[in-house]
């Protein structure tokens, strides 16, 4: 998210008033960026919730196992599966954020605010 700081720095360096078209262009770029980030979050949170609910049910079921060795192996597998699911959801969300910021930087340059 380094783009946020560079965009802010660029805004502070500018002098004078901007025309309405430029202001609207930047506002649209902001909307596009933030809506893309929100869509990434809309995908992430249900995936994270499902991963946690799956882990919860699986762990409870594992604790019905009376054999300690089998239970230990099952629990290890459950945690590994949860870790992979949670990581996949986070990676997808971060990827969406990265794409949104790159597109914002490109869109903002097109607006040419000085």
Label each residue range with its predicted role.
Residues 1-7:
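C-terminal segment of classical bacterial N-terminal signal peptides
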Residues 8-114:
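Soluble, non-transmembrane alpha-helical interaction regions
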């Amino acid at each position: 998210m380094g783009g946020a700081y560079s965009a802010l720095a660029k805004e502070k360096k500018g002098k004078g008033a901007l025309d309405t078209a430029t202001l609207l262009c930047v506002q649209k770029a902001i909307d596009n960026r933030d809506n893309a980030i929100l869509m990434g979050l809309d995908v992430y949170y249900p995936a994270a919730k499902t991963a946690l609910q799956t882990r919860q049910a699986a762990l409870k079921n594992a604790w019905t196992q009376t054999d300690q060795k089998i239970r230990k192996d099952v629990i290890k597998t459950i945690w590994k599966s949860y870790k992979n699911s949670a990581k996949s959801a986070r990676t997808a969300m971060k990827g969406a954020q990265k794409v949104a910021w790159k597109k914002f930087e490109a869109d903002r340059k097109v607006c040419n605010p000085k």
